[in-house]
């Protein structure tokens, strides 16, 4: 069977990770594809931060740049003449793919470059990537630190406060009163996104709405928004407290431990709607419900938080969709403003997600009407 592009990309990633750094010609020989094909693959993977490329070489994003390559990264010929931006995010796919694309679009529009480092939720790699980008000459940084979901430690806040270049926090918050709160911040209003879903379901007549969440940095805000909306509507909370050990590594079996509780509530007739994060879990829940003979939306209404897979589910899912591209774009623009004027007012920006109504709630509305 012929190897797909995705399979070849995975093989390229495995090879480069094993070597740390290598020439593109060497990579082409090891993969067994033409040099032109591998060059296109490397460009595509570098665009989303999964690889780093420089003057005929390719390296793993977490590999430390030697002094020569760091100088070349700063001095590389380019049509852009603006400041060099650095970006550190946990992963290049899923939520952050759109964020990276938005930041790249803003950088390109401003005539500047964006270098991306990936941490895979490792605090050690986060510190390494920040150092790499600063040594490469980054004039400012877009940062999504690899903190625990509960928030940063005091030491982690101090590290932010000691940064020697302008920085904008991306989809992260420093606790009020802590060091680092003076940094600019751009992110999604996840709490209001959860409340939006609750209001939509309540507007359709639901009075018992379950909440199933996987452990993530988004979880506290989603739980806060859900609880606030349920209280405002004077409805009882049905928070099933799903979760995993760490963002990006939450085990499916931990999340699915809550399914029997949800099933019992459905079968008793008490609960006929749920908000589920992530949309991958919402799609899995849809399949589990179908296996139990529970129809969506006839017997049960389902809203997913996030919109990566929701539209292509067997029953297209109503979803709350964070504006990832817009978040990345706004963060990059904010960083460019900070670099241009270090004394300008500090800004915290939160973008409201969108409610995309499909088939899984039994209603097709143009938008959340504030019910």
What are these regions (language model features)?
Residues 195-235, 347-360:
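An alpha-beta-alpha
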């Amino acid at each position: 069977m012929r190897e797909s592009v995705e399979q070849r990309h995975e093989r390229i990633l495995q090879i480069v990770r094993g070597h740390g750094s290598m020439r593109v010609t060497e990579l082409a020989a090891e993969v067994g594809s033409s040099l032109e094909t591998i060059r296109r693959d490397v460009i595509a993977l570098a665009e989303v931060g999964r690889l780093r490329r420089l003057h005929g070489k390719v390296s793993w994003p977490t590999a430390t740049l030697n002094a020569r390559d760091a100088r070349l990264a700063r001095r590389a010929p380019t049509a852009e003449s603006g400041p060099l931006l650095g970006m550190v995010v946990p992963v290049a796919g899923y939520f952050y793919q759109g964020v990276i694309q938005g930041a790249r679009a803003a950088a390109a529009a401003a005539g500047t470059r964006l270098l991306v480092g990936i941490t895979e939720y490792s605090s050690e790699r986060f510190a390494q990537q920040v150092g790499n980008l600063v040594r490469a000459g980054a004039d400012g940084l877009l940062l999504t630190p690899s903190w625990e979901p509960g928030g940063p430690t005091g030491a982690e806040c101090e590290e932010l406060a000691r940064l020697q270049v302008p920085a904008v926090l991306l989809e992260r918050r420093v606790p009020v009163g802590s060091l680092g709160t003076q940094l600019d911040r751009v992110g999604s209003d996840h709490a209001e996104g959860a409340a939006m879903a609750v209001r939509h379901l309540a507007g359709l007549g639901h009075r018992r709405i379950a909440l199933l969440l996987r452990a993530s940095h988004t979880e506290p805000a989603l739980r806060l928004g859900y609880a606030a909306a349920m209280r405002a509507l004077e409805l009882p909370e049905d928070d099933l407290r799903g979760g995993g050990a760490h963002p990006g590594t939450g085990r499916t079996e931990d999340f699915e431990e809550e399914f029997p509780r949800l099933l019992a509530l459905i079968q008793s007739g008490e609960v006929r709607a749920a908000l589920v994060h992530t949309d991958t879990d919402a799609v899995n829940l849809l399949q589990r419900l179908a296996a139990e003979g529970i129809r969506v939306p006839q017997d049960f209404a389902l809203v997913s938080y996030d919109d990566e897979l929701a539209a292509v589910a067997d029953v297209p899912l109503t979803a709350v969709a964070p504006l990832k591209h817009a978040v990345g774009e706004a963060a990059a623009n904010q960083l460019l403003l900070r670099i241009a004027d270090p004394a300008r007012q500090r800004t915290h920006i939160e973008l409201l997600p969108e409610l995309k109504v499909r088939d899984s709630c039994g209603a097709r509305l143009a938008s959340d009407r504030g019910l």
